[in-house]
UniProtKB/Swiss-Prot annotation:
Name this polypeptide is given: Mini-ribonuclease 3
Quaternary structure and partners: Homodimer.
Primary location class: cytoplasm
PANTHER family: MINI-RIBONUCLEASE 3
The gene coding this protein: mrnC
Keywords, alphabetical: Cytoplasm, Endonuclease, Hydrolase, Magnesium, Nuclease, Ribosome biogenesis, RNA-binding, rRNA processing, rRNA-binding
Enzyme's top EC category: hydrolase
Pfam families the UniProt entry points to: Ribonuclease_3 (PF00636)
Cofactor (UniProt): Mg(2+)
A single BP term in Gene Ontology: rRNA processing
Organism of origin: Symbiobacterium thermophilum (strain DSM 24528 / JCM 14929 / IAM 14863 / T)
Function: Involved in correct processing of both the 5' and 3' ends of 23S rRNA precursor. Processes 30S rRNA precursor transcript even in absence of ribonuclease 3 (Rnc); Rnc processes 30S rRNA into smaller rRNA precursors.
Classification of source organism: Bacteria, Bacillati, Bacillota, Clostridia, Eubacteriales
Catalytic residues (positions): 19
SMART domains (alphabetical): RIBOc
Length: 130
């Protein structure tokens, strides 16, 4: 999809979309690796999608992000109104929101190749054991 200027959207809207896109990417990746039982899919997906994992991914990716991508991450990380669940560390949850905002932004900006690079790097990072 391509939106004229996804930067005009609220960062939490970008993160909302990015969350769904990343979750779908992870599920597809797990299916490709032979996981077909729902319980196995769910258990393995948690390694990729928990706030702790996404915060670690973001920390790993930040040096490789462009200035504009880092700005999107900052907007997502600093957005108000995304209170962390009681079980999550607020800083990690904010960082994971920044990662999700980046994913949503890249998708809406029509940057499919860059989105694929970011998602692949994220999954590879988790699979290497962080």
């Amino acid at each position: 999809m391509r939106l004229a200027n996804p930067l005009t959207l609220p960062p939490l809207t970008l993160a909302y979309l990015g969350d769904a896109l990343y979750e779908a990417f992870v599920r597809e990746r797990l299916l490709e690796r032979g996981y077909v039982r729902v319980n196995d899919l769910h258990r393995h997906a948690l390694r990729y999608v928990q706030a702790t994992a996404q915060a670690a991914i973001l920390h790993h990716l930040m040096p490789a992000l462009t200035e504009q991508e880092q700005d999107v991450v900052r907007r997502g990380r600093n957005a108000k109104g995304h209170g962390a669940p009681k079980s999550a560390d607020p800083a990690e949850y904010a960082a994971s929101t920044g990662f999700e905002a980046l994913v949503g932004y890249l998708y809406l900006a029509g940057q499919a190749e860059r989105l694929s690079e970011v998602l692949q790097a994220a999954a590879d990072f988790i699979e290497r054991g962080q």
